[in-house]
Amino acid sequence: MRRGFDALLLALPLAAAAAPPCDKPLYLSFDTGHMGVAPLVAEVLARQQVKATFFLANERTLSGGSSLDDQWAPWWKARAAEGHAFGSHTWDHDSWLADVGTAVRVKPSQGPQAGQVRTLDAAGYCAELQRPAQRFEAMTGQKMQALFRAPGGKTSPALLAAARSCGWSHVGWTPAGFLGDELPSERHSNAQLLQRALRDIRAGDILLAHLGIWSRRDAWAPAVLEPLIAGLKQRGFCFATLRDHPQFAAVPTR
């Protein structure tokens, strides 16, 4: 018994050395997109042993379907099983335009009303937030934390109040965390974006990228993603999901 206890004591420092405390955390996040790079993103994250947070909207894909349809359900289920975190990006990718009293005027880029301006009261906006969570649970068997990212990061007092009324908390990104994958590659090359990110990112930053951008000619992922993660690790950074962010850790699931 004593020998076994001594062996356990010897093993404890080794275990601690294998997983040092993370004192320079970064929070990598992805919004849905055309999903063309999604399998490659998943491969990089697995290879680098990085957990990220995904914000889900039902967006049109390269294959002609949508990012939350049955074709993609196994992909989302696999990411959930790997321990990534998830939030809502509104079902129809509703971009805020204006407050109308306590309601909000938005323009969806997806769904049957894509491109049409519509006004949503608090209940209507809550339904837009909740639909991705419901679909996520149907696909994965897991509940989503009540975190959301408004498309384009555009919020307002009425929009945030509507979200709070049904228990949702907004997550933006930090200035240096804007990784630039939606910028035109003719003016913002992958090499430039990588160099800027490695230069500017600081501990605690929330990083933003997408699972495919229609307008960018030279895809940002995985060309920038893997060297970015590797370079940040070399600088002493580590990665965590927004479940572990001090501002959002207490947010419940929906």
Regions found by a protein language model. Name each.
Residues 19-104, 109-113, 117-120, 124, ...:
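Active-site beta->alpha N-cap acidic-glycine motif
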Residues 98-105, 182-187, 217-223, 251-254:
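Histidine/acidic-residue-rich catalytic or RNA/ligand-binding cores of hydrolases
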Residues 1-11:
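Sec-dependent signal peptide recognition
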Residues 19-20, 52, 62, 217-254:
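C-terminal domain-boundary segment and adjacent tail
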